[in-house]
Each structure stands twice: as structure tokens, then as C-alpha cells.
């Protein structure tokens, strides 16, 4: 088995049909991708092969995610909750997305939100704010809006974008020297925003940055 020798599937609490809910979560940005079901056999197959397998309640059979669509899922980590009756799979999603509709996530229908920005489309539900920001900026680069500051920077090009990064970095340094925590947070946010604009202009994905950070995890940090 590919999992910890200290773990036994018998620790898990399957329902009266022998199933347990499994939530698939993007291993890099934390976005919730889908909810499916597993039985002991599909869980064992997943742990042994690292290719995620679920139990189809409609077809009453095990199915390897993406076997026909190509949208496969590779297991990075798996956890169970405090009641031992639910799983979270940290996975690498391949293909067009986790949802059969072609969306990245199955959870694209919003009921309510306390977000201050009611117009921004959330392409990665429940993901971290930096990934959501990058998705919004990337969308802006594809579908420009009149008077958009982001589109202004992208139109002006490298020199303007890099100049802004330099200015914001200098302001961040001054905020640190002044020990002004509110300004430090504000200027750090400005740097992240302008860095992401530069990445988009250069055709570099935010996930590329996350992949580099992930590769450095635990290396003499």
C-alpha cells in the first residue's frame, strides 16, 4: 500500500451502503473541485495507484476519474475528518476540469456570498484569494473593460508594469522602516497585484509560481 502503515481502512466509518463521501480539493490553490463517493475497493485502488477512483451510485461500479474524458485526478494527499466518516482528497486535476460541464469545479452555482465585489466572477470556488485575484486579472486581459486599471497597465506594457512594481516595492520598504503594519499590508497587497499583472503580461501562470513554491517546501526553510 502507498499509505501510512499506521492507517487502516477499518478506522473509517462507511454508511449502510458501504460508502463514504470524498471531497476533491486542488492541491495547489485549495479550491473545492467536486464531491463523490468511495467504497473500500475504490479507496484501496486510489491509495495503491494514486489515480483517483470513485464509486458510481448510478451505475453501481467503480470508475477511474477521467477514464473517458481525460480529466484524471492524481492523489497527492488524503485525510479523514474527526468523525472518521468523510474524506478530503488533495489532488492534481488534469484535463479541462473536475466537472462534466467543463468547469474547473462542480461548485459554480452560488447561493450567497459576503464578498464586497458582487460583479467579479469566481472561477475557483473557495480557493485562496491570490489565485482568485489572478483568475480575475486573467479574465480582464481576455475581456477588457473600459477604464480598467489592469487593462491600462497591460496596454502600456513591460516598462510601465515594471516601473509600478519598483515603486510599490520602494513604498513597501518605507512602510517596513516606519513599522506601520497597516501600510505594510497595503503595500504588500499592491506588490502582489502588480506582480500578477506582470505574470499575465509575460504569459506565466500563477500556478507556475505555486508549483515552484511547492517544490521548495521543506527545503531548509
Curated annotation (Swiss-Prot):
Subcellular location: Cytoplasm
Ranges for region Phosphoribosyl-ATP pyrophosphohydrolase: 130-221
Keyword terms: Amino-acid biosynthesis, ATP-binding, Cytoplasm, Histidine biosynthesis, Hydrolase, Multifunctional enzyme, Nucleotide-binding
Reactions catalysed, as given in the entry: 1-(5-phospho-beta-D-ribosyl)-ATP + H2O = 1-(5-phospho-beta-D-ribosyl)-5'-AMP + diphosphate + H(+); 1-(5-phospho-beta-D-ribosyl)-5'-AMP + H2O = 1-(5-phospho-beta-D-ribosyl)-5-[(5-phospho-beta-D-ribosylamino)methylideneamino]imidazole-4-carboxamide
Annotated protein name in UniProt: Histidine biosynthesis bifunctional protein HisIE
Predominant localisation class: cytoplasm
Keyword Hydrolase tagged: yes
Transmembrane parts of this sequence: none
BP terms from Gene Ontology: L-histidine biosynthetic process
Homology family: In the N-terminal section; belongs to the PRA-CH family. In the C-terminal section; belongs to the PRA-PH family.
InterPro entries, A to Z: His_synth_HisIE, HisE, PRA-CH, PRib-ATP_PPHydrolase-like, PRib_AMP_CycHydrolase_dom, PRib_AMP_CycHydrolase_sf
Amino acid at each position: 500500500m502507498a499509505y501510512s502503515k499506521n492507517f487502516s481502512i477499518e478506522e473509517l466509518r462507511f454508511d449502510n451502503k458501504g460508502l463514504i463521501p470524498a471531497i476533491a480539493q486542488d492541491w495547489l490553490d485549495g479550491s473545492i473541485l467536486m464531491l463523490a463517493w468511495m467504497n473500500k475497493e475504490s479507496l484501496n485502488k486510489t491509495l495503491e495507484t494514486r489515480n483517483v477512483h470513485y464509486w458510481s451510485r448510478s451505475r453501481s461500479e467503480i470508475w477511474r476519474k477521467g477514464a473517458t474524458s481525460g480529466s484524471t485526478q492524481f492523489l497527492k494527499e488524503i485525510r479523514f475528518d474527526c468523525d472518521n466518516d468523510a474524506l478530503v482528497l488533495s489532488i492534481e486535476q488534469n484535463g479541462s476540469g473536475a466537472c462534466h460541464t467543463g468547469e474547473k469545479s462542480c461548485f459554480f452555482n452560488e447561493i450567497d456570498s459576503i464578498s464586497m465585489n458582487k460583479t467579479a466572477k469566481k472561477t475557483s470556488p473557495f480557493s485562496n484569494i491570490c489565485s482568485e485575484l489572478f483568475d480575475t486579472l486573467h479574465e480582464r486581459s481576455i475581456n477588457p473593460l473600459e477604464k480598467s486599471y489592469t487593462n491600462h497597465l497591460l496596454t502600456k506594457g513591460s516598462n510601465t508594469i515594471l516601473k509600478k512594481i519598483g515603486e510599490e516595492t520602494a513604498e513597501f520598504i518605507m512602510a517596513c522602516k516606519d513599522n506601520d503594519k497597516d501600510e505594510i499590508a497595503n503595500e504588500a497587497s499592491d506588490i502582489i497585484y502588480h506582480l500578477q499583472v506582470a505574470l499575465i503580461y509575460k504569459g506565466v501562470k500563477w500556478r507556475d509560481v505555486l508549483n515552484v513554491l511547492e517544490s521548495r517546501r521543506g527545503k531548509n526553510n
